[in-house]
Amino acid sequence: MVYHNSMCTYLFYNKIGFGLDYQLSVYLGLATTIVCIVLFFTMLKPLGTRDEEAYINN
C-alpha cells in the first residue's frame, strides 16, 4: 500500500505527471490507493470449490 500511494502521489505531483499541488497529490494518491485495494478485494474470486472432507477437524 505504501508503494502504491507514493507512486500515485509522485505521478500527481511531478511535472511528468499532472503537476498538481503537493498536498492535493498526497490526498489523491491515498484515495487512489484505497479505491484500488477495495476493487482488488471485491473482485477477487475463489479459485475453486471447497472440499470440506480435506479438513482434519471435521
Curated annotation (Swiss-Prot):
Presence of keyword Membrane: yes
Keyword vocabulary terms for this entry: Membrane, Transmembrane, Transmembrane helix
Membrane-spanning segments: 24-44
Gene Ontology terms: cellular component: membrane
Top-level taxonomic group: Bacteria
Cell compartments where the protein resides: Membrane
Membrane topology annotation: Single-pass membrane protein
Keyword Membrane included in the entry's annotation: yes
Name under which the protein is recorded: Uncharacterized protein HI_1128
